């Protein structure tokens, strides 16, 4: 065992071989490096697989031995200051190592085919491998200095990956937005680290926690300073994990390739903030105000993320807001003292969300030959539908991921989310009510996404649902064809620009590109042509893209059972509790308390009922766009009653506008901060150009004219220049003599 731990420090550097080899190859032998293009994917997967095997061995030893290992190298700068660099292996580290490596391998295998035709193939795999290196270094860090170094590297990699297609202005703006937003959190983190060192005199975690706890218990430090510096540390996690109010970068980060989105949302950037909170939880637990702040930010984030996802039409942005909401659950858990539930949901959500993002990539990959390669069309759920017959495997995997995120048993997220809900009732009934309500919203928007994507018919082949076959526009009413005139068709499925006012009852249409329309056939084609891989219809992805989906399905089905307490309090079968024993004991938690299965079953029935209600509402509104609502007497009678519609319409429009416009938070930031800062920058630029540059330019111009004047007086002869020079020197000496004599006379008297 000791020998395995002794080599744990090498883990972050194994994937680093890929970007270094690609860089040297392109520098020294570019032709040979590009000729073995696809081999770099195999190289990346192989090296990360070695790390995964190493991590699995460490995790097994953690479960069996409950052992915390720390290896340090001391770098002494002088007698008063020494910096220790090292590697820390504990339950949290081993969990993160398994997540990063397993999800990373699946994403790399998937990316080999997904990015095969991209000109930036080598740059993509170099950036992905360097991102894995940065995250592995972050989770194995033994002190705050190492944390900050790898923290910045993770941010840099995310910046490069989000802006991978930097020639697109939207992608360039998205990576800048992510970079600037995270600068706020990173600056807070740096100040917090320096503040903690000022208080404790140590960067190393174990020493820092002990010194800090002693100072708190002995009232050896001002509580206001402690709270302030701890808040700055938490600010870094808020920005990195897209928590309110620094969440605005997350949906725009979807401008990168879909495998990047899967990696960022499941195992790297957004998880880094959660990891930081978990790592510093022994410090936060002795500061009640910080724990209250963490739980408050978590509950606000989970609710806002769910409401913002309700009306999004971009499949990746819907999943992005889903990630924001689920990260709110994970952030809520440590805030209410539920370290185990936070770790549990971190695991289950990672695999479910990776499955959903890679599934969405398969969908987008199949839609691009039909609607074009613009994300506004290939990622638009309004143009999808009916993909079940074309993407049967993707459909099954996406459905399982959706059910897991909805909290339907026995899938993974059910067990972890229910544990958070149970603990939230003990902490605050208000927080518990919000969390349970958000469970219903999650089920609604996730099934809305699934139904719009896979059910009914392929809507891109409809020129207009109302029957105007010659029109180049199309709109769909969720109330059915016959009710479209009653409710001014276009409802939820209308599409608009971001700067337009959105209404649930607006009559809007979506224009299909004329080049794409020339490729289309009538929708009434025979099934013989449907099964062919033609540009007119989507087709299932290749095996290299489907294999990661199937593997992630296995994780989604079974990974939840590692945290189920089958044992009635005996820790032989509760794998997660055994895994977390050292950390939870350090946080003074007792895992031997009896597990109340009756209470768990009661709460589970309640939460599953809420989720099923959300699924039912989504099925009611989106499940039968074309036919079912025509024959649904309840819905037809509902829409025919004008008084009810008058009452319902303003409420729905307010909710829809709030969701579609992201709560107007982005608009507020753009108005107050972006325009304000740009205005200030223009003002300072104008001052610099006109005043500062004016002064320096004025001296230059004055010198020029003086020189020209002297040249004119001298006439271009050297003798004249010498005469003028001697004259000026003589005048200067005479003036100096008289001034010196006057000064001496004044001093004498």
Curated annotation (Swiss-Prot):
Organism listed in the record: Illicium oligandrum
Protein name: NAD(P)H-quinone oxidoreductase subunit 5, chloroplastic
Domain of life: Eukaryota
Catalytic class of the enzyme: translocase
Residues of the signal peptide: none
Name of the gene this protein is made from: ndhF
Segments crossing the lipid bilayer: 9-29, 40-60, 89-109, 147-167, 185-205, 219-239, 258-278, 280-300, 327-347, 354-374, 396-416, 425-445, 544-564, 605-625, 694-714, 722-742
Cellular localisation: Plastid, Chloroplast thylakoid membrane
Keyword Acetylation in annotation: no
Pfam family, one: Proton_antipo_N
Keywords carried by this UniProt record: Chloroplast, Membrane, NAD, NADP, Plastid, Plastoquinone, Quinone, Thylakoid, Translocase, Transmembrane, Transmembrane helix, Transport
Gene Ontology cellular component terms for the protein in this record: chloroplast thylakoid membrane
């Amino acid at each position: 065992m000791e020998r395995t731990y002794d080599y744990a420090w090498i883990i972050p550097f194994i994937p680093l071989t890929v970007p270094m080899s690609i860089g040297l190859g392109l520098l020294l032998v570019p032709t040979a490096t590009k000729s073995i293009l696809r081999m770099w994917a195999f190289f990346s997967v192989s090296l990360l697989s070695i790390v995964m095997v190493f991590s699995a061995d460490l995790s097994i030893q953690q479960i069996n031995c409950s052992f915390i290992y720390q290896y340090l190298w001391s770098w002494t700068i002088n007698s008063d200051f020494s910096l220790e660099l090292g590697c820390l292996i504990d339950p949290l580290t081993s969990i993160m190592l398994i997540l990063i490596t397993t999800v990373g391998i699946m994403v790399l295998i998937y990316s080999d085919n997904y990015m095969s035709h991209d000109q930036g193939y080598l740059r993509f795999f170099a950036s992905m491998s360097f991102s894995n290196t940065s995250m592995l270094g972050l989770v194995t860090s033994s002190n705050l200095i190492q944390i900050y170094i790898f923290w910045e590297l993770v941010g840099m990699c995310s910046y490069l990956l989000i802006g991978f297609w930097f020639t697109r202005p939207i992608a360039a703006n998205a990576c800048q937005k992510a970079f600037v937003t995270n600068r706020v959190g990173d600056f807070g983190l740096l100040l917090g680290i320096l503040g903690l060192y000022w208080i404790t005199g140590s960067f190393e975690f174990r020493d820092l926690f002990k010194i800090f706890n002693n100072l708190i218990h002995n009232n050896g430090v001002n509580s206001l300073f402690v709270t302030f510096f701890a808040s700055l540390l938490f600010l870094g996690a808020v920005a990195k994990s897209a928590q309110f109010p620094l969440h605005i970068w997350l949906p725009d980060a979807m401008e990168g390739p879909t495998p990047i989105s899967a990696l960022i949302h499941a195992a790297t950037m957004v998880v880094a903030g959660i990891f930081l909170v978990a790592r510093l939880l022994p410090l936060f637990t002795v500061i009640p105000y910080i724990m209250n702040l963490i739980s408050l930010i978590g509950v606000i984030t989970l609710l806002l993320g769910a409401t913002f996802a309700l009306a999004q039409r971009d499949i990746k942005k819907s999943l992005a807001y889903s990630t924001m909401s689920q990260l709110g659950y994970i952030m809520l858990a440590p805030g209410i003292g539920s370290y185990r539930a936070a770790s549990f949901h971190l695991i289950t959500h990672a695999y479910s969300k990776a499955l959903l993002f890679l599934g969405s990539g398969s969908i987008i990959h199949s839609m691009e030959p039909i609607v074009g390669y613009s994300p506004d069309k290939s990622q638009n759920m309004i143009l999808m539908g009916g993909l079940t017959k074309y993407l049967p495997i993707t459909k099954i995997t996406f459905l399982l991921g959706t059910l897991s995120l909805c909290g339907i048993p026995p899938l993974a997220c059910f067990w972890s989310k229910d544990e958070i809900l149970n603990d939230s009732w003990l902490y605050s009934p208000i927080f518990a009510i919000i969390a349970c309500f958000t469970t219903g919203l999650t089920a609604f928007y996730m099934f809305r996404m699934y139904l719009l994507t896979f059910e009914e018919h392929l809507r891109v082949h409809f020129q207009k649902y109302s029957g105007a076959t010659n029109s180049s526009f199309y709109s769909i009413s969720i109330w059915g064809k016959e009710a479209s005139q009653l409710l001014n068709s276009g409802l939820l499925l209308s599409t608009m620009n971001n700067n337009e006012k959105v209404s649930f009852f607006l009559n809007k249409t979506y224009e299909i590109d004329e080049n794409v329309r020339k490729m289309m056939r009538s929708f009434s084609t025979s099934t013989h042509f449907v099964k062919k891989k033609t540009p007119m219809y989507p087709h299932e992805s290749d095996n290299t893209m489907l294999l990661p989906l199937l593997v992630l399905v296995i994780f989604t089905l079974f990974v939840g059972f590692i945290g189920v307490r089958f044992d009635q309090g005996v820790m032989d079968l509760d794998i997660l509790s055994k895994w977390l024993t050292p950390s939870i004991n350090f946080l003074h938690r007792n895992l031997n308390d009896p597990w109340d299965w009756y209470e768990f079953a009661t709460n589970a029935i309640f939460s599953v009922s809420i989720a099923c209600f959300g699924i039912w509402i989504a099925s009611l509104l989106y499940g039968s766009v074309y036919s079912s609502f025509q024959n649904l007497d309840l819905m037809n009678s509902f829409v025919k009653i004008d008084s009810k519609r008058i009452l319902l319409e303003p409420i729905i429009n307010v909710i829809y506008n709030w969701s579609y416009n992201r709560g107007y938070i982005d608009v507020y930031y753009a108005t107050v901060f972006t325009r304000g800062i740009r205005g200030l920058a223009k003002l300072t630029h104008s001052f610099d150009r006109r005043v500062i540059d004016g002064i320096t330019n004025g001296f230059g111009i004055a010198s020029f004219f003086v020189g020209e004047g002297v040249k004119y007086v001298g006439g271009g002869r050297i003798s004249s220049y010498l005469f003028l020079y001697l004259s000026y020197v003589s005048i200067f000496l005479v003036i100096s003599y008289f001034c010196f004599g006057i000064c001496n006379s004044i001093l004498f008297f």
